[in-house]
Amino acid sequence: MAVSYKKLWKLLIDKDMKKKDLCVKAGISSASVTKMGKGGHVTTEVLVKICTALECTMDDIVDIIL
């Protein structure tokens, strides 16, 4: 099962935010953002922090590809 974060990157563009801004606002490590940039898996806790910071749902930032 693969994961796509294309929606997250588009949302960051729409909000005029950089990945570094996301790290600070969500309180997540740059390693987590790098992992997502490579299509890797991150913990649900990281995704929840991102959703809280961006005021969105997981469906707004992640696609699961079967």
Predicted regions span which residues?
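Short C-terminal boundary/hinge segments that cap the last helix of small helical domains
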Residues: 55-66
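Recognition helix of helix-turn-helix/homeodomain-like DNA-binding domains
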Residues: 28-42
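The alpha-helix within a helix-turn-helix
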Residues: 12, 23, 51
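Short, basic-rich loop-to-helix N-cap that marks the start of a DNA-contacting helix
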Residues: 39-52
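Residue-level detection of the helix-turn-helix DNA-binding "recognition helix"
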Residues: 13, 27, 38, 66
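A short, Lys/Arg-rich alpha-helix, primarily the initiator
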Residues: 1-18
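Residues in the helix-turn-helix
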Residues: 32, 46, 60
